[in-house]
């Protein structure tokens, strides 16, 4: 595959994954913090605080998972490299 096409595909996938994460975060935090039947157009202070905390936790967890997955990926690559060196 052409390196430019691969880079473009990777960028498109990253945008798609970020959009998916944003949509899931929005839905989860809205369900948790905003009652299904509300009377006012503006968020209450409690709802706004809940949403702030929910988003912060969601993003923190997303960052932690990303770091852990990267760490596991590096470990897997090392194991594969050692296995390939041992059989070669």
From Swiss-Prot:
Example GO BP: protein insertion into mitochondrial inner membrane
Domain of life of the native organism: Eukaryota
One cellular component term from this protein's GO annotations in UniProt: mitochondrial inner membrane
Keywords assigned by UniProt, alphabetized: Chaperone, Disulfide bond, Membrane, Metal-binding, Mitochondrion, Mitochondrion inner membrane, Protein transport, Translocation, Transport, Zinc
Motif segment (Twin CX3C motif): 29-54
Paired cysteines (S-S): 29-54, 33-50
UniProt topology in membrane: Peripheral membrane protein
Transmembrane regions: none
GO MF annotation list: metal ion binding
Keyword Transport listed: yes
Subcellular location: Mitochondrion inner membrane
Pfam families hit by this protein: zf-Tim10_DDP
Keyword Hydrolase among UniProt keywords: no
Role description: Mitochondrial intermembrane chaperone that participates in the import and insertion of multi-pass transmembrane proteins into the mitochondrial inner membrane. May also be required for the transfer of beta-barrel precursors from the TOM complex to the sorting and assembly machinery (SAM complex) of the outer membrane. Acts as a chaperone-like protein that protects the hydrophobic precursors from aggregation and guide them through the mitochondrial intermembrane space.
The record's note on its domains: The twin CX3C motif contains 4 conserved Cys residues that form 2 disulfide bonds in the mitochondrial intermembrane space. However, during the transit of TIMM10 from cytoplasm into mitochondrion, the Cys residues probably coordinate zinc, thereby preventing folding and allowing its transfer across mitochondrial outer membrane.
PANTHER family the record matches: MITOCHONDRIAL IMPORT INNER MEMBRANE TRANSLOCASE SUBUNIT TIM10
Family membership: Belongs to the small Tim family.
Quaternary context: Heterohexamer; composed of 3 copies of TIMM9 and 3 copies of TIMM10/TIM10A, named soluble 70 kDa complex. The complex forms a 6-bladed alpha-propeller structure and associates with the TIMM22 component of the TIM22 complex. Interacts with multi-pass transmembrane proteins in transit.
Stated name of the protein: Mitochondrial import inner membrane translocase subunit Tim10
Organism phylogeny: Eukaryota, Metazoa, Chordata, Craniata, Vertebrata
